[in-house]
C-alpha cells in the first residue's frame, strides 16, 4: 500500500475517533483482486472469461496488506476495529447462467467448499493482525459471512475462522438494507419504493411501507 495513501487513511481514522466514534477499517471494494482470484487453476472471471489464478498468492497478498495496515495502527485503542473484507463473494461474477454452479442471476452458488476459501482469507488477515503485536494482539476483528448476506450465516458459523488470539476477539458481520427502502428513488412497474418504516407511516400507505 502506498505510504501516502495509508497516511490519508490514518488522518480519517483520527478524525473519526477524535469525534468520539468508533472507526471500522476494511478493504472495501477491491476491484476483484480478492474475490475473483481465489481458485487455483482455471475458472471463469467477473467478465465471464476463462482465466487462471493462484489462490495461495492471493492469501499472501491479503496477509501482506494487513501486515502493513496492522503495523500502522497497532498502538490505537479499542476505538479502532479491523474488518477482514467487505462483502466477499469468492468469485461472485455477474452475467452467468443457471448452469455449471451458477444461479439464474449470474452469481456463483456459494457452498461449503467456497466457505473454506473465504475462511482462509479471513485467517490470513487474523494472522497478520495478531503477529503485529501491540494492541492488535486482542483488537476486535470483523469477519464476514459469504457476500455478507444474513441468510448465509450458517456457512460462516459452521466453519468459523480460527483466531490466534483465542475466542472473544472477533465479530460476525451481516448486511441487511432492503433495496426498496435504501436505494430505490421511485415506483417501478414491478415494485413500489418504500418511504416509511413499519408504524412510522403518516396515514394508510401500506404499499410504500417496509415491514421489518
In which residue ranges do the predicted regions lie?
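Substrate-binding cleft and catalytic face of glycoside hydrolase catalytic domains
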Residues: 1-90
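Active-site region of glycoside hydrolase catalytic domains
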Residues: 50, 56-212
Amino acid at each position: 500500500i502506498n505510504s501516502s495513501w495509508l497516511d490519508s487513511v490514518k488522518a480519517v481514522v483520527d478524525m473519526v475517533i477524535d469525534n468520539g466514534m468508533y472507526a471500522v477499517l476494511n478493504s472495501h471494494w477491491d476491484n476483484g483482486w480478492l474475490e475473483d482470484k481465489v481458485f487455483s487453476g482455471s475458472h471463469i472471471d467477473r467478465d465471464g472469461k476463462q482465466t487462471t489464478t493462484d489462490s495461495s498468492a492471493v492469501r499472501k497478498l491479503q496477509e501482506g496488506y494487513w501486515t502493513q495496515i496492522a503495523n500502522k495502527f497497532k498502538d490505537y485503542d479499542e476505538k479502532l476495529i479491523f474488518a477482514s473484507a467487505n462483502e466477499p463473494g469468492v468469485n461472485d461474477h455477474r452475467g452467468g447462467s443457471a448452469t455449471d454452479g451458477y444461479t439464474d442471476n449470474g452469481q456463483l452458488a456459494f457452498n461449503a467448499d467456497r466457505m473454506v476459501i473465504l475462511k482462509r482469507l479471513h485467517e490470513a488477515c487474523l494472522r497478520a493482525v495478531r503477529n503485529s503485536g501491540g494492541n492488535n494482539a486482542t483488537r476486535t476483528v470483523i469477519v464476514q459471512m459469504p457476500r455478507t448476506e444474513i441468510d448465509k450465516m450458517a456457512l460462516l458459523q459452521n466453519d468459523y475462522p480460527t483466531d490466534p488470539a483465542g475466542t472473544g476477539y472477533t465479530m460476525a458481520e451481516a448486511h441487511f438494507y432492503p433495496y426498496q427502502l435504501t436505494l430505490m428513488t421511485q415506483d417501478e412497474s414491478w415494485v413500489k419504493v418504500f418511504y416509511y418504516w413499519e408504524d412510522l407511516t403518516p396515514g394508510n400507505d401500506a404499499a410504500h411501507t417496509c415491514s421489518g
